[in-house]
């Protein structure tokens, strides 16, 4: 189903009445709310679940959910996870199995009763996490919708899945929640860069192949933060014969080189990524103003030294689609700086 929404978005997939039927036999309902655009739909869903099944425990997670605690609690949510929730949800399960509904001692959790418990620590060794049970998900239904990351594909069906090779990011851009994820914060230092081992990554990819996945979306916030490691992984992915997409944005400085003081693009790395199966790349240019990049985007890109146009042209020559991320509307951003961003985006569209 595709239902147009009042805000211009389109809701795809199960509608609220379908969800109510699906969850009828369950005691606990978990809902992710990561992005602002999901707020209204999630709020309506929580309200409806609470109305029809007031006895069910409703748990929310995600950056958007935790940033609007009062709103979602008023809608009917019981608990909201404040940080990475793989371990938190286990603790919630233990409480439920004990016959209690007192969750006030669990770290990284907020409750409608008013408690907000800071995240005491985050998992450092990602290999300790169990491998996602992809085979238990109704993947075929998602493949038939063919709308990964909200974008339509020309194919009638896309056999895809999402993975993460790492978590966190070494940069602290102001517009990203990671800039607030620091040691001793309420949410814990989930912004710290943590890496899965190569063997763990290959194990996950092999499992995805076994269940029929052909297109893998890599969700890392900083895929190339460790270039030597990334190249080693890409070399091992070549034989997998999969199509890959980096969707959250590759730091463009990582796609450039500096030899004898002269900057250039890392053609070898782009060619390796193409050989590994990359078909889509997202370039986070962020702004046409160097001042804005320096102030709000950790100075991660130098518009003069890093030749974005050359990167785009090289990627396209390797038959990779390129998308760009651009931001504007900062409190002290001038009209001229906004226009410079629009002009730069138009230039890149023509490259």
Give short role names for the model-derived ranges.
Residues 1-202:
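Acidic, low-complexity intrinsically disordered segments
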Residues 31, 60, 246, 324-326:
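Structural beta-sheet core signal
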Residues 39-40, 69, 227-228, 335-336:
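Short N-terminal helix/helix-N-cap motif within the alpha/beta-hydrolase-1
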Residues 132-322, 343:
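Radical SAM [4Fe-4S] cluster-binding motif and immediate context
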Residues 320-327, 348-350:
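Conserved beta-strand->loop/alpha-helix structural units within folded catalytic cores of enzymes
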């Amino acid at each position: 189903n595709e239902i147009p929404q009042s805000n211009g978005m389109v809701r795809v997939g199960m509608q609220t009445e379908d969800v109510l039927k699906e969850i009828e036999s369950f005691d606990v309902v978990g809902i992710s709310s990561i992005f602002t655009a999901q707020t209204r739909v999630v709020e309506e869903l929580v309200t409806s679940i609470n109305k029809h099944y007031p006895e069910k425990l409703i748990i929310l997670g995600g950056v958007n959910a935790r940033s609007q605690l009062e709103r979602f609690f008023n809608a009917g949510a019981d608990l909201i996870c404040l940080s990475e929730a793989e371990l938190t949800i286990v603790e919630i399960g233990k409480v439920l199995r004990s016959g209690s509904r007192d969750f006030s001692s669990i770290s990284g959790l907020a409750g409608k009763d008013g408690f907000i418990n800071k995240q005491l620590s985050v998992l450092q060794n990602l290999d300790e996490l169990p491998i996602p049970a992809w085979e238990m998900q109704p993947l075929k239904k998602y493949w038939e919708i063919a709308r990964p990351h909200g974008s339509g594909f020309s194919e009638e069906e896309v056999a895809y899945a999402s993975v993460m090779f790492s978590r966190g990011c070494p940069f602290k851009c102001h517009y990203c929640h990671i800039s607030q994820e620091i040691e001793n914060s309420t949410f814990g230092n989930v912004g710290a860069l943590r890496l899965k081992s190569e063997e763990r990554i290959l194990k996950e990819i092999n499992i995805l192949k076994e269940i029929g996945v052909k297109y893998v979306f890599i969700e890392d916030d900083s895929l190339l933060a460790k270039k030597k490691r990334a190249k080693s992984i890409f070399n091992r992915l070549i034989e997998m014969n999969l199509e890959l997409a980096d969707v959250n944005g590759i730091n463009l400085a990582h796609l450039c080189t500096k030899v004898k003081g002269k900057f250039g693009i890392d053609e070898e790395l782009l060619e390796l990524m193409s050989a590994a199966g990359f078909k889509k790349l997202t370039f986070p240019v962020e702004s046409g103003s160097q001042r804005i990049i320096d102030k709000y985007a950790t100075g991660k890109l130098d518009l003069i030294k890093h030749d974005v146009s050359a990167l785009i042209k090289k990627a396209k020559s390797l038959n990779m689609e390129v998308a760009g991320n651009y931001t504007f509307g900062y409190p002290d951003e001038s009209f001229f700086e906004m226009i410079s961003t629009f002009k730069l985006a138009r230039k890149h569209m023509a490259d």
